């Protein structure tokens, strides 16, 4: 339970000061994480008791929808969103310009007859330390191959176009003209570059493969698009009708960024006056410009519709990219992939994280007439064209609370993949399930129960908690002697199994340890700017 020094201010606000409303400034506090039920709280739960009957308003960054929803659900907070810090160019483009030009010349004209240029590229690559990130050799008299140059080109373009945050956002202070320009470019340039390239693809000027190649887009479209946008944004015309339709969204984003600062305070005052704080989706403005303007009441996603059709395609693509990278490096498919899922990415991608796991397993969603994902279908082995990959999924407490039905769906997916019989390729899910069952029986679990538990692959915080408990070990490093103690603490705190309705949240530490064993790939999808 919270100490009396924590309880006293909240109780004084209610009983002594007799406040009309409560305002928190995030992100984030700890009131929403005090002990008690995850959902359906009562006065016997600390979060509910400490807020009482006070209207609760919470200034919250629009970029952290995952944790914001916890405050909305456990403290009935009205989340008044505020802007994220402004964006800035990383300044890396100029540093890599010459290297990129040399790489493109080699790729366009071939490495034959350009040995000296190839040597120069390698020397510069080694000087910049890029070879270490890509695990390329640094032998000075051995130029890179065309395949290695393509990898180097993609990696360098990614760094050169990297976005980064500038100074902290100060509420009440509009972005400077420079910050406004850079943030508007960050929100709009990539989308416009791809739209321009898509139009060229439809006209037959480029191929679909080129359209899907980030390096190609970054080199052939992004510089021109940024130049067009910068010219328009630095001198916006008074008559918007004079602006070509493809540039109008960027001007709208600029106006929404300007309006956000005043809108944030106006929304708070409107709420305190008993008015409505209008709703809006939450998320990062770069990923979802619809969060603009800020100063609105942030909401989540309908978990039952996830993964939505776009997220399904994104998840498949990401899963295939993972497998391609692994097979390219190791010459074989991974047998088991471990995922760590947080609520924020689940919400902002509308389920692309789930889609990755489904596609690894070789199953796909089945939707009802309202777009809800209500069932799963096994993708035939011949259609999948590869082994079914075993998985283990670790989830945050926030994701467990907002998407419990999806965790059950993940377990159903594992069960479906485990029972697949049409195997033209190995089924690592089935072999993993058999091994799980065997290990459980050896530890004394009844054969019937071991069979039921063998398909469990989803684990999260125990006792309705929200923490791995690792922070405590970090803060009290003198209290442990061996790193194995930290690993054991992690298993103790994250070993609750989710996905089985009859045994929801049951602590299965041994099962969790077994599920984590022999993992080939570890992934935590993150995309916040």
Please provide the spans of the model-predicted regions.
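Ligand/cofactor-recognition surfaces for anionic moieties
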Residues: 1-529
């Amino acid at each position: 339970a919270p100490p009396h020094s924590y309880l006293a201010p909240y109780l004084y606000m209610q009983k002594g000061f007799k406040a009309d409303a409560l305002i928190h400034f995030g992100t984030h506090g700890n009131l929403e994480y005090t002990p008690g039920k995850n959902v359906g709280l009562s006065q016997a739960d600390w979060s509910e008791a400490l807020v009482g009957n006070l209207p609760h308003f919470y200034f919250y960054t629009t970029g952290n929808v995952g944790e914001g929803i916890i405050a909305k659900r456990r403290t009935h907070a009205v989340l008044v969103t505020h802007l994220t810090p402004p964006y800035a160019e990383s300044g890396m483009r100029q540093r890599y310009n010459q290297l990129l030009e040399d790489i493109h010349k080699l790729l366009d004209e071939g490495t034959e007859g350009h040995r000296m240029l190839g040597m120069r590229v390698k020397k510069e690559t080694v000087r910049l330390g890029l070879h270490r990130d890509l695990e390329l050799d640094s032998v000075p008299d051995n130029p890179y191959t065309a395949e290695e140059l393509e990898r180097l080109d993609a990696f360098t373009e990614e760094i050169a176009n990297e976005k980064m945050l500038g100074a902290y956002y100060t509420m009440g202070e509009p972005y400077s003209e420079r910050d406004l320009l850079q943030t508007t470019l960050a929100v709009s340039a990539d989308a416009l570059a791809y739209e321009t390239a898509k139009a060229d693809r439809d006209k037959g000027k480029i191929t679909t493969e080129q359209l899907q190649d980030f390096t190609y887009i970054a080199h052939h479209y992004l510089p021109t698009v940024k130049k067009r946008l910068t010219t328009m944004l630095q001198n916006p015309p008074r008559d918007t009708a004079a602006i070509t339709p493809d540039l109008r969204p960027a001007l709208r984003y600029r106006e929404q960024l300007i309006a956000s600062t005043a809108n944030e305070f106006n929304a708070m005052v409107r709420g305190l006056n008993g008015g409505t704080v209008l709703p809006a989706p939450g998320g990062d403005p770069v990923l979802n410009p619809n969060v603009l303007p800020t100063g609105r009441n942030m909401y989540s996603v309908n978990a039952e519709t996830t993964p939505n059709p776009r997220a399904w395609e994104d998840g498949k693509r990401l899963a295939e990219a993972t497998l391609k990278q692994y097979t390219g490096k190791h010459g074989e498919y991974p047998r088991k992939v471990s995922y760590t899922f947080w609520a924020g990415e689940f919400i902002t991608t509308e389920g692309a994280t789930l889609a990755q796991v489904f596609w690894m397993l070789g199953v796909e969603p089945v939707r009802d007439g309202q777009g809800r994902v209500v069932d799963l279908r096994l993708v035939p082995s011949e259609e999948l064209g590869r082994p079914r990959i075993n998985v283990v999924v670790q989830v945050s407490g926030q994701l467990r609370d907002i998407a419990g039905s999806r965790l059950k769906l993940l377990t159903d997916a594992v069960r479906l993949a485990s029972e697949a019989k049409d195997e033209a390729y190995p089924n690592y899910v089935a072999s993993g399930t058999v091994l799980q069952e065997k290990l459980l029986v050896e530890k004394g679990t009844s054969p019937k129960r071991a069979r039921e538990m063998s398909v469990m692959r989803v684990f999260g915080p125990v006792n309705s908690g929200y923490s791995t408990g690792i922070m405590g070990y970090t803060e009290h490093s003198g209290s442990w002697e061996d790193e194995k103690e930290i690993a054991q603490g992690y298993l103790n705190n994250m070993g609750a199994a989710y996905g089985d309705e009859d045994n929801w949240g049951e602590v299965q530490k041994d099962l969790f340890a077994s599920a984590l064993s022999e993992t080939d790939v570890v992934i935590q999808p993150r995309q916040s700017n």
